[in-house]
Amino acid sequence: MESAEIRRRWLSFYEERGHTVVPSASLIADDPTLLLVPAGMVPFKPYFLGEVKPPWPRATSVQKCVRTPDIEEVGKTTRHGTFFQMCGNFSFGDYFKEGAITYAWELLTTPQDKGGYGLDPERLWITVYLDDDEAETIWRDKIGVPAERIQRLGKKDNYWSMGVPGPCGPCSEINYDRGPEFGVEGGPAVNDERYVEIWNLVFMQYERGEGTSKDDFEILGDLPQKNIDTGLGMERLAMILQGVQNMYEIDTSMAVIQKATELTGVEYGAAHGSDVSLRVVTDHMRTSVMLIGDGVTPGNEGRGYVLRRIMRRAIRNMRLLGATGPVVKDLVDVVIAMMGQQYPELISDRQRIETVALAEEAAFLKTLKAGTNILDTAVTETKASGGQVLPGDKAFLLHDTWGFPIDLTLEMAAEQGLSVDEDGFRRLMKEQRERAKADAQSKKTGHADLGAYREIADAAGETDFIGYTQTEGESTIVGILVDGVSSPAATEGDEVEIVLDRTPFYAEGGGQIGDTGRIKVESGAIIEVRDCQKPVPGVYVHKGVVQVGEVTVGAKAQVSIDVRRRKAIARAHSATHLTHQALRDALGPTAAQAGSENQPGRFRFDFGSPSAVPTTVMTDVEQQINEVLARDLDVQAEVMSIDEAKKQGAIAEFGEKYGERVRVVTIGDFSKELCGGTHVHNTAQLGLVKLLGESSIGSGVRRIEALVGVDAYNFLAREHTVVAQIQELVKGRPEELPEKVSAMLGKLKDAEKEIERFRAEKVLQAAAGLVDSAKDVRGIALVTGQVPDGTTADDLRRLVLDVRGRIQGGRPAVVALFTTVGGKPLTVIATNEAARERGLKAGDLVRAAAKTLGGGGGGKPDVAQGGGQNPAAIGEAIDAVERLVTETAK
């Protein structure tokens, strides 16, 4: 039975029994405690916790899941995989143990021609929790499972919880006996390789408290209602129904193995080591495609790191199998072909998935060889010194410079019999993060110590921000810092940081830079505010200089921002939102914001994309943005619950932690984002947006630079002036410029070719004369000399090789020519095969010459290049070459 049919029968069976079919949620968990969805119940977690009332009493789903804790075991065992599909049925206060058990038995044992899976009841074994008499009674008396095939196990095996206080309960597992060829008999309590678990029924009826381990926690009492959460591993059931040895050989996986064998020429089943690599490739490529399909892009943190890690393991294992060229596209295509029937969105999104995967493959292949060489050298050095642990600094170098995930280094070191100093590696990583954090903080505050700000916050409370509705107001100074130290007062000329009880100044955050302005103290003192930061939550710090008078803590003040500057920043920030939405419209949801900076009249916007955005797409994005400006759309901000924001479709990183209340900025019917920044009131106030271009700032991240309003107009005006000047030079209209400039460049290229031809002729003429000057040194035809100054390195090399080629008759030949370029000596030396057979290598000769010239050089045995600092020593260098030829020639 094909996997797609297993899935169809599952959903059909439960739908016929009153369950609502719920589509698989994204692998990107809508839960700040999870990177990825690891189980079928995760999307239903709010219902089990009682946070949200379920819209139906019964539900069923086939949920995409990813688990990576046992990634090193993938391929080595038949039970570990990173991607799997969890078939689940759920009851929220409806049926309980008897209903769940009855449904499960019916679906598993009903003959296939009657809609079931047709498993032999005699091969099914049951485990129940140690004290769960009720479940055992149902299995034995209601279902008819013999008592000898029901086993009781403890909390570790048959009691489920999420690992934290919350819902929990005993569970009952259904296991399938694969037969004596898989090990000794005795049931799942004895051999879980032979008696493989296929279905877990969780009877969620209690609430657990704190605990120290999986089987050590307190049961606090009953839940308000009893729930059912079951999970059947589709891949494990497919393994049984398709009669194969392991999960890697089922229909949706075997096709990938076959493609990998086709690409490498290594047959599956030929050897244990190659089989492990083939299974790793199969599992990891399936997982990669599903993750990319759900919007994950490779990166160095979070779920992006998970994807990068498994993709690079797959690529490296293909290299171990003998692949030499790119392989990812072929593997991606076969995964989509296999999984597309169940998840048609993979087919429609094929181009984007391929683009992301190919970009990661290209990035890794650039560093794989060099990184592997670094690792091999480190391993050799470690072994030579008698060590068994690869130093942490080597692992850090591989990660930081060559993009090797630490897991890959661990694996490759283990293959050579070494462990890795993980503590040392993590210490260096921590130091790097702390340096970056301190650098970023010191750039904002001038120092990295935040204690003074916290003391002010503890004493005076958080700053009341009034800047959404006011640009000026009355305030009280509650804190003064001079050189990062709290002070009761500051005087004229002091650089200060002022904390107010209330302020209209926006503190840098969310990509928007801080406001500037003035603080006028009641005593007459004036502070010019040059920046506003929020170094700790809730504390607004106004950085500036006391221009007049003395400032004291507790003084009343009139504060005002630079309104013109604020408006220019607001235009940039609103334009950023429009750009974000236009990019998502053009490229899809993966063009998610990765960073931004909004300044007066200009902004930059970073977003996820595996490759450069075509110019035509950028043009369309810019046009769409400016069309929105012309629609005079209102811009509104509203504070609401995070759940309401999600419901309204507001763009946000919902994997991040937000408070219960969030601010949502809506631009007409075009854009809706969570945002704490300041904005225009209407899109017409932006005037004009001009995208200057986009570029790469890292793997999978692109950056757009843009201008807004008057700055955009001034840019276009300058461009118009430049175009007019070019028109005057080439005597053409604007629309003719590309053709005319192209023609001029063509003529220039032709002229360069003609110059190159003359240069080549000059080299040939010089070569003929040099051959005639060859000197016989112990049977070696030695040509030496100095050619005119200014001869390029390429021309000198071309001349040397031409002279070498003109020495006929099989005579051993050495050609050593010198010149000066930019006042510094340069030499190229070449030997023919006959000379090399007599022990003369170009690299050795160049090093001897370059040493005399006060420099260095090297190259291959047949041709090498060197240079130095002393052109006056060229004659001595020629003599050094001749001496070495005389001494070395055999």
UniProtKB/Swiss-Prot annotation:
CDD domains, per the entry: AlaRS_core
Main location (coarse class): cytoplasm
InterPro entries: aa-tRNA-synth_II/BPL/LPL, Ala-tRNA-lgiase_IIc, Ala-tRNA-ligase_IIc_anticod-bd, Ala-tRNA-synth_IIc_core, Ala-tRNA-synth_IIc_N, Ala-tRNA_ligase, Ala_tRNA_ligase_euk/bac, DHHA1_dom
PROSITE patterns: AA_TRNA_LIGASE_II_ALA (PS50860)
GO cellular component, one term: cytosol
Annotated positions binding Zn(2+): 573, 577, 675, 679
One GO biological process term: alanyl-tRNA aminoacylation
Co-factor binding details: Binds 1 zinc ion per subunit.
SMART domains xref list: tRNA_SAD
Domain of life: Bacteria
Pfam families in alphabetical order: DHHA1, tRNA-synt_2c, tRNA_SAD
Cofactors, names only: Zn(2+)
Sequence similarity: Belongs to the class-II aminoacyl-tRNA synthetase family.
Record note on domains: Consists of three domains; the N-terminal catalytic domain, the editing domain and the C-terminal C-Ala domain. The editing domain removes incorrectly charged amino acids, while the C-Ala domain, along with tRNA(Ala), serves as a bridge to cooperatively bring together the editing and aminoacylation centers thus stimulating deacylation of misacylated tRNAs.
Name listed for the protein in its UniProt record: Alanine--tRNA ligase
Lineage per the UniProt record: Bacteria, Bacillati, Actinomycetota, Actinomycetes, Kitasatosporales
